[in-house]
Amino acid sequence: MPRFTIHDLAATIDARAASGGDASYTRKLLDKGSGHCAKKFGEEAVETVIAAIENDRHHLIAEGADLMFHFLVLLKARGVTFEDIEFALAQRTTMSGLEEKAARNRE
């Protein structure tokens, strides 16, 4: 199976978002607004947690994929790119987790 990365998924979401009248699921989510996208992300997060608690590997993988998709759609709805998230993660690697958390609390 060919490798499919989170960047590939983000590019697919970008293409479907730009597709105008296309009836894709992605386009329908975005057309309903960021609030709806956030609710869908929350639903998928709960389903992912349940799968993890139930120790169901197959279900966790499926729900994790759904969660990643809905996270990227939510980011798109709010004008945030995955590269923005990567930048924030990269900044955090320059300090320990405890230092990073303390810095956030000062802001």
Curated annotation (Swiss-Prot):
Which Pfam families does the record match to this protein? PRA-PH (PF01503)
Taxonomic superkingdom: Bacteria
Which Gene3D superfamilies does the record associate with it?
MazG-like (1.10.287.1080)
Q: Name one GO biological process term.
A: L-histidine biosynthetic process
For this UniProt record, the keywords arranged alphabetically read as follows: Amino-acid biosynthesis, ATP-binding, Cytoplasm, Histidine biosynthesis, Hydrolase, Nucleotide-binding
Look at the named UniProt entry and state the broad enzyme category this protein falls under: hydrolase
UniProt-listed InterPro entries: HisE, PRib-ATP_PPHydrolase-like
EC number(s) recorded for this UniProt protein: 3.6.1.31
**Cell compartment(s), UniProt:** Cytoplasm
Pathway the protein contributes to: Amino-acid biosynthesis; L-histidine biosynthesis; L-histidine from 5-phospho-alpha-D-ribose 1-diphosphate: step 2/9
**Catalysed conversion reaction:** 1-(5-phospho-beta-D-ribosyl)-ATP + H2O = 1-(5-phospho-beta-D-ribosyl)-5'-AMP + diphosphate + H(+)
Q: Name one GO molecular function term.
A: ATP binding
One GO location term (cellular component): cytoplasm
Q: Which PANTHER family match?
A: HISTIDINE BIOSYNTHESIS BIFUNCTIONAL PROTEIN, HISTIDINE BIOSYNTHESIS BIFUNCTIONAL PROTEIN HIS7
Q: Which NCBIfam families match?
A: histidine_hisI, PRK00400.1-5
Query: In which family does this protein belong, per the annotation?
Result: Belongs to the PRA-PH family.
What name does the UniProt record give this protein?
A: Phosphoribosyl-ATP pyrophosphatase
> What gene makes this protein?
hisE
